[in-house]
């Protein structure tokens, strides 16, 4: 999905472009849950929001590999907000695809201020604890919230080869590729300290994922 970083009335903003192809219609994940109370005004997690239930939605369209790719990506960036309205399927006549992934605001240590980042970066034990703390909204069993790595471990017992293939999608993540992206972020958006933090976070989480899957 194409995005741009900009400034509006003195505030830093992200412009996310419409990703729908002509004639396509987006159905968000919540549309597939008959017990989702859509009239509450804000998203709440639907009952039974588990990997297996989401699988029953996407697998008839041949999109299980795309679901696994999404789970691996969320684990990589520590996305803690992949609720049912933060993904969807794009329909056009008899064609269906998983929508490009969107809304990753709750990723990469988004809630940490600079002082907290500095403290974590200066203490290896704190950094390791932070790496393992990222929680997934997608669960293995209803009511049991787990971190991304435990989710991957549970899925591996069901979809070993599919998960191995999904992990290949992050094979290009290395020191050079990550830094070449991070260095493009303007200084008023990301400090040098946070660049180093995100750089280390991505590489460490990639290593954790590969150890679990391979």
Predicted features, each with a name:
Residues 28-55:
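Amphipathic, charge-rich alpha-helical segments that serve as recognition/docking helices
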Residues 90-214:
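C-terminal catalytic region of ATP-dependent kinase domains
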């Amino acid at each position: 999905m194409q995005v741009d970083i900009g400034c509006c009335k003195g505030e830093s903003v992200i412009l996310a472009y419409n990703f729908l192809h002509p004639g396509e219609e987006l159905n968000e994940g919540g549309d597939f849950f008959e017990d989702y109370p859509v009239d509450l005004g804000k998203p709440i997690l639907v009952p039974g929001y588990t990997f297996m239930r989401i699988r029953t939605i996407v697998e008839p369209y041949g999109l299980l590999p795309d679901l696994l790719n999404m789970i691996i990506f969320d684990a990589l960036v520590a996305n803690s907000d992949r609720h049912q309205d933060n993904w969807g399927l794009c329909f056009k006549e008899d064609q269906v695809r998983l929508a490009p992934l969107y809304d990753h605001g709750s990723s990469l240590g988004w809630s940490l201020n600079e002082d907290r980042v500095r403290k974590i970066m200066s203490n290896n034990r704190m950094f390791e604890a932070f790496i393992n703390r990222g929680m997934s909204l997608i669960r293995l069993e209803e009511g049991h919230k787990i971190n991304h790595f435990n989710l991957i471990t549970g899925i591996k017992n069901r979809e070993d080869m599919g998960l191995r293939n999904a992990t290949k999608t992050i094979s290009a993540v290395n020191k050079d590729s990550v830094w070449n992206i991070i260095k493009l972020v303007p200084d008023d958006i990301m400090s040098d300290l946070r660049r180093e933090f995100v750089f280390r976070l991505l590489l460490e989480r990639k290593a954790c994922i590969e150890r679990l899957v391979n």
